[in-house]
Regions:
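Beta-rich, blade/repeat-based domains predominating
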Residues: 16-32, 39-41, 60-76, 103-121, ...
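Beta-propeller fold detector
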Residues: 10-11, 55-59, 96-100, 147-150, ...
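A short helix->beta-strand "capping" segment at the edge of beta-propeller domains
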Residues: 1-20, 192
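Short loop/turn segments immediately following the C-termini of beta-strands
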Residues: 39-40, 80, 126-128, 173, ...
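A short loop-to-beta-strand structural motif that recurs across blades of beta-propeller domains
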Residues: 43-45, 84-86, 134-137, 177-179, ...
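Beta-propeller domains
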Residues: 36-56
Length: 286
């Protein structure tokens, strides 16, 4: 493993609290340093930057999966129960149903959102459990969507855009693959390029650091992988007890610290990576 055990700890334990942090899947960091995550009953939680308190800000009424902030500070949440992407206007607390998919092609399992530099939202669609299918949608700022990558994927999951916006990394969970899709000059999707195969692992959430390393939260086994730009795969940290890392899913950076959600328990984990994460959304203006 690349990291010693003392670099990994529980950031917030919501097992017995009120509100209870129930099996969080998505995690995102706001510009004020607060850490946001979702619950299995649609709750949207905000944790103070130091992890000392939690507030249920809003709810989709469904099951929250991946989430991402846009440049204005609003939070976008993929919801499995409603098969939709919701938008939380953070300033007012209002939740709107933002997108249901493309005309004639609704979302099936919208799983993970990622913004590009001009405010378009890429959304993975996991299709169906056990049935490969397309793919990745792209949603305009006004909510209009297209099926951007229409090739079959075996459970498209986490997404991460390269710093220059030239390619989109995708976790293909049930094939144990990571691949990238070049974004052509006209904005269309290129052909997939394999990044790494991680046999025995179920890759879920993705994040990138400023050196171009790709970080992968793995639902099984409970570990985070790091893949360098050459495609070398290392285990950043593995929890053989599935206790501190308990089936981690999504991962998000705040400076050199990474936060992981844990679908298997009721807490968030903090990992001191030691390398600055790529600030999101990508692009100039920070």
């Amino acid at each position: 493993m690349l990291l010693a055990d003392d670099r990994v700890s529980v950031f917030f334990d919501g097992t017995l609290g009120d509100p209870q942090l129930d099996h969080p899947e998505g995690v995102a960091v706001a510009t004020d340093g607060s850490v946001w995550c979702g619950g299995e009953r649609g709750q949207i939680f905000r944790l103070d930057p130091d992890g000392t308190s939690i507030e249920e800000v809003a709810s989709t009424g469904g099951f929250c999966l991946g989430m991402a902030f846009d440049r204005s500070g609003d939070l976008f949440i993929c919801d499995m129960k409603h098969a939709a992407v919701f938008r939380l206007e953070v300033a007012s607390g209002r939740v709107d149903r933002f997108c249901d998919g493309a005309p004639g092609r609704p979302f099936l399992i919208p799983n993970y959102p990622a913004f590009d530099a001009v405010g378009r939202l890429y959304v993975s669609d996991s299709h169906r459990f056990g049935a490969p299918g397309p793919g990745v949608f792209r949603v305009e700022p006004d909510g209009r969507a297209e099926l951007w990558y229409d090739r079959d994927v075996t459970f498209a999951n986490g997404l991460a855009l390269a710093a220059d916006g030239s390619e989109l990394f995708v976790a293909e969970t049930f094939a144990s693959n990571l691949f990238r899709i070049p974004i052509r000059e006209d904005g269309s999707a290129g052909e997939r390029e394999e990044v790494a195969h991680v046999p025995g692992s179920l890759p879920d959430g993705l994040a990138i650091d400023v050196d171009g390393n790709l970080y992968v939260g793995c639902y099984e086994p409970s570990q985070v992988l790091r893949i360098d730009p050459a495609g070398t795969v290392d285990v950043l940290w593995h929890d053989v007890t599935a206790h501190t890392l308990a089936h981690p899913t999504n991962v998000a950076f705040r400076g050199t610290t990474m936060f992981t959600s844990n679908l298997g328990r009721w807490h968030l984990t903090r990992i001191e990576v030691g390398i600055e994460g790529l600030r999101l959304p990508i692009g100039d203006g920070w």
